């Protein structure tokens, strides 16, 4: 695969040459920074990248709707917590990509990311989100296993004689 850079009178475009097939990628449009807010959230081993923009309340996680991605309704309610707290439900669209960890960690990472993005969007939300504990990163992670033991804290059975 060979990458060619082609200069035209239009903005710079990238052409990719793959086995005698030439495809041209158009440049991405510039996004107005005043209407879109970005934040990252973390929980356990999960990292969520969250983009928040003014909209109708649509939430997309890894190119799936929130109901398709999270099967449990309690997870969805937890993720919507920052919007309920700030009374902004159905006012923002959320697009996020999340990697690593399990479902619970990913839920926490998305929640943290949405809270941080809402904080950036309007400074008056900061006090509400801080009081609700949504801006603080939950630093609890799995304790490591120790040698000579079965698990992190479980020991082998002790025999007196």
Swiss-Prot record:
One of its GO terms (cellular component) is cytosolic small ribosomal subunit. Gene3D superfamilies: 3.30.230.10. GO terms for biological process: translation. Keywords: Ribonucleoprotein, Ribosomal protein. InterPro entries: Ribosomal_Su5_D2-typ_SF, Ribosomal_uS9, Ribosomal_uS9_bac/plastid, Ribosomal_uS9_CS, Ribsml_uS5_D2-typ_fold_subgr. GO terms for molecular function: RNA binding; structural constituent of ribosome. Signal peptide: none annotated. Belongs to the universal ribosomal protein uS9 family. This is Small ribosomal subunit protein uS9. It comes from Rickettsia canadensis (strain McKiel). The gene is rpsI.
